[in-house]
Amino acid sequence: MTIALGRFTKEENDLFDIMDDWLRRDRFVFVGWSGLLLFPCAYFALGGWFTGTTFVTSWYTHGLASSYLEGCNFLTAAVSTPANSLAHSLLLLWGPEAQGDFTRWCQLGGLWTFVALHGAFALIGFMLRQFELARSVQLRPYNAIAFSGPIAVFVSVFLIYPLGQSGWFFAPSFGVAAIFRFILFFQGFHNWTLNPFHMMGVAGVLGAALLCAIHGATVENTLFEDGDGANTFRAFNPTQAEETYSMVTANRFWSQIFGVAFSNKRWLHFFMLFVPVTGLWMSALGVVGLALNLRAYDFVSQEIRAAEDPEFETFYTKNILLNEGIRAWMAAQDQPHENLIFPEEVLPRGNAL
């Protein structure tokens, strides 16, 4: 009797292997399995945004002009959110609101949900692309982990916040001036600048910018001479064995400046990763809190004293009055369907007026 020992082999024409070979082939633009999610979603999100900013009005949802066709420019055009009355409807083209009518779908704000959802999945696909490529070339996955910060901010601001409110109407519209309006809304209705999570986010983003500037300048300052003056772009190559700059010199310099300095490149670069990503995640957590209408810091004692004493005012109490003004003016303008009317005497006035 003959016993054959060997490994079971798949059919040569296995569909998965064929797809895997084609998707992960070495080409100018890597596709990969993540590309099946990234490329279609990014295409539809960008295409929807360009279509909306070029042709689609916001008259039916916000009472505004928002397209190039109506006279807007790059800074004022936007794909605006659906009307407040549509709540959290996905606004599918074939749904009960538009009933397959593309023009009606655009008028109702269907492009916003289209761009928001495809944009979110495109960002997730881009993160998966970094995971996939890192695994293919045997890198650690910190690029993908870092990109989770922008994804967290996008999802919290554009999806989770309006889900916690009465509808998509209260999310930001996709446009430059529209985002600015949303920032003013956040300040007026949530006192966002006094929120500790916003403070951590600002510290993370600006701290990362500072670290990046310091790091780049320090490396440029400590380049080894190579016979070509200060320019090392032609003298050094990617596979060189020696270092391009002197970490020891950089350490001595900053030790004299601050009294402390990074002595380890790994800790230095991890810190440059940790600061901005943590800041973005903290901001995202703060926005999730705002979705639930959690309040920022309140210094009630100062408000009470300012109300009782006309001569007492702080920057905090002035900002609270400013927030009241934002709410009074923005609510009437931004939610015309509510028919809000504020008489002159109820609009906030500071003690100095």
Swiss-Prot record:
Residues annotated as transmembrane: 41-61, 125-141, 153-166, 208-228, 279-295
Record protein name field: Photosystem II D2 protein
Record-listed pheophytin a binding positions: 130, 143
Domain of life: Eukaryota
Residues annotated as binding chlorophyll a PD2: 198
Record-listed E.C. numbers: 1.10.3.9
Gene3D superfamilies: Photosystem II protein D1-like
Source species of the chain: Lemna minor (Common duckweed)
Principal EC category: oxidoreductase
Pfam name, any one: Photo_RC
N-acetylthreonine modifications at: 2
GO CC field: chloroplast thylakoid membrane; photosystem II
CDD domains named among the record's database cross-references: Photosystem-II_D2
Catalytic activity annotation: 2 a plastoquinone + 4 hnu + 2 H2O = 2 a plastoquinol + O2
Name of the encoding gene: psbD
Annotated compartments: Plastid, Chloroplast thylakoid membrane
Keyword set includes Repressor: no
InterPro entries per the UniProt record, alphabetical: D1/D2, Photo_II_D1/D2_sf, Photo_RC_L/M, Photo_RC_L/M_CS, PSII_PsbD/D2
Cofactor, free-text remark: The D1/D2 heterodimer binds P680, chlorophylls that are the primary electron donor of PSII, and subsequent electron acceptors. It shares a non-heme iron and each subunit binds pheophytin, quinone, additional chlorophylls, carotenoids and lipids. There is also a Cl(-1) ion associated with D1 and D2, which is required for oxygen evolution. The PSII complex binds additional chlorophylls, carotenoids and specific lipids.
Phylogenetic classification of the source organism: Eukaryota, Viridiplantae, Streptophyta, Embryophyta, Tracheophyta
Membrane topology label: Multi-pass membrane protein
Keyword Cell membrane: no
Example GO BP: photosynthetic electron transport in photosystem II
More info: 2 of the reaction center chlorophylls (ChlD1 and ChlD2) are entirely coordinated by water.
Matches recorded under HAMAP family: PSII_PsbD_D2 (MF_01383)
